[in-house]
Amino acid sequence: MAKFVFVTGGVVSSIGKGIVAASLGRLLKSRGYSVSILKLDPYLNVDPGTMSPFQHGEVFVTEDGAETDLDLGHYERFTDTAMSRLNSVTTGSIYQAVINKERRGDYNGGTVQVIPHITGEIRERIHRVAANSGADVVITEIGGTVGDIESLPFLEAIREFRGDVGRNDLAYIHVTLLPFIGTSGELKTKPTQHSVKELRAIGIQPDVLVCRSDRPINEDLKRKIGGFCGVPNRAVIPALDADSIYAVPISLEEEGLCLEMLDVLNLTDHDSDMKNWVQLVHKLRNPGPAVKVALVGKYVQLNDAYLSVVEALRHACLTQDASLELSWVCAEQIETHGPENLLKGMDAVVVPGGFGNRGVDGKIAAIRWAREQRVPFLGLCLGMQCAVIEWARNQAGLTGASSAELEPDTSHPVIHLLPEQQDVVDLGGTMRLGVYPCRIAPDTLAQKLYGEEVVYERHRHRYEFNNSYRNLFIESGYTISGSSPDGRLVELIELKGHPFFTACQYHPEFLSRPGKPHPLFRGLIEAAQLRLPASPDEALRRQSQTNISAQEKPSRIG
């Protein structure tokens, strides 16, 4: 039978509940326990798929095509375990399910109420994750802050859950903040005390307090917090601000979080294998030469809008012994100031996904600059579509070429709506979503990077390359290096003769992991490193490779 851990947060929002949940998952997995993590979000949207990135950050897509909270990306990256649509629950989806049941008559004419129907549906979703995943431990993060009206049904549901499984099979973690007041020179515990008081009023006594702070927490303070909040001193876990989110599991392990959880849940403490993770953090803190990467996007004012892209770049830099020097470039600024002024000196350019025509001309200009200046380029989803438009206009002779999404009346719709999307009216959950296979063409950069004939990648799009222009693109120099197995959909393109120029219709960033970077991102960083001034050892290695290549070339004499 599964064990259950519930993670709540208090005092302020964005306290780091998701990282705590993901870190605990990492620590449990390092001891041989299987883990699944789900997020309960208190907003009324059915899912975040139609929400603005400025409101919510990126939308993370699961293998089965769910559009979910970005925290699921943290869960997958930390535990290296694929989540599903069951791992993302919103108030909107709960109410939708309950109302549908009421309309079908499932409640036999009874009055439908928050208790027991809404809370019962929430509990059922948690049980469903346990049954579907078969995990030893199911960790549930409750979104929002204790005291919010929106979170009350979720908190009541996890209180009731204790009756479902018994007290020895679940644990409550409360993440809170200890603010430092400069005038008094002290970390203050009163906000934490009041947050726990709110939680107790609901009927939940936390087993562990994870206390965020920007400076060390001494034993006297831990005793004070434990005494006022009713937890053992050892269960007051300091969580100091870290230089990287990947350092948090190590910090929490040193403070005893996992041992305390194992004790509460009556689980055996197996030997922990965190060696690779410790090495990863060491490399993060001791990086190699910086690689300058420009991320050209529409939503660059909010870094979380491209969270998985940034993490994928970090993973690639880690493996390549490089440090990431990221420049956030607003696509609209390129339209105003030109690409040369904003991209000069960059070692690589990434154009990620997005929607709408704002900033598209800037993205196209950035892609043209990368192509002509021979700067390594990677396009993702809309980034591939912009690369197609750029080539059509400037190399294939298709004046005015565009996407049917951006310019419905364009004379050359090189990007058009997928046939199966023609009659779709609703926006939410109706795109081409989730994992689809892609067949890699032989003798291509893609084949070199992947080393596979067929790969499986996550998608989120309605528009696709228009095959009416396929032959023209090939004849003008484009290489279609990846397609759907039936050859109908173009998934991956590249340019031969360029140091690194490739773009894909899918989202490879969702599959990148610490220590296991996605091949496309690793290839980009590897190509970018070739632009860096070579160290003496590296220069010697490159010269050696050049000499070997020259010896292998057939003679042209005679």
Curated annotation (Swiss-Prot):
SUPFAM superfamilies per record: Class I glutamine amidotransferase-like, P-loop containing nucleoside triphosphate hydrolases
Binding-site list for ATP: S14, I15, G16, K17, G18, I19, D71
Activity control: Allosterically activated by GTP, when glutamine is the substrate; GTP has no effect on the reaction when ammonia is the substrate. The allosteric effector GTP functions by stabilizing the protein conformation that binds the tetrahedral intermediate(s) formed during glutamine hydrolysis. Inhibited by the product CTP, via allosteric rather than competitive inhibition.
GO biological process: 'de novo' CTP biosynthetic process; pyrimidine nucleobase biosynthetic process
Catalysed reaction, written as an equation: UTP + L-glutamine + ATP + H2O = CTP + L-glutamate + ADP + phosphate + 2 H(+); L-glutamine + H2O = L-glutamate + NH4(+); UTP + NH4(+) + ATP = CTP + ADP + phosphate + 2 H(+)
Residues reported to bind CTP: S13, D148, I149, E150, K188, T189, K190, P191, T192, Q193, K224
Binding of UTP, residues: S13, K188, T189, K190, P191, T192, Q193, K224
Keywords of the record: ATP-binding, Glutamine amidotransferase, Ligase, Magnesium, Metal-binding, Nucleotide-binding, Pyrimidine biosynthesis
Catalytic class of the enzyme: ligase
One MF annotation (Gene Ontology) recorded for this entry: glutaminase activity
Annotated Glutamine amidotransferase type-1 domain residues: 292-534
PROSITE patterns: GATASE_TYPE_1
Region (Amidoligase domain): 1-267
Miscellaneous information on this protein: CTPSs have evolved a hybrid strategy for distinguishing between UTP and CTP. The overlapping regions of the product feedback inhibitory and substrate sites recognize a common feature in both compounds, the triphosphate moiety. To differentiate isosteric substrate and product pyrimidine rings, an additional pocket far from the expected kinase/ligase catalytic site, specifically recognizes the cytosine and ribose portions of the product inhibitor.
Subunit structure: Homotetramer.
Name of this chain's protein: CTP synthase
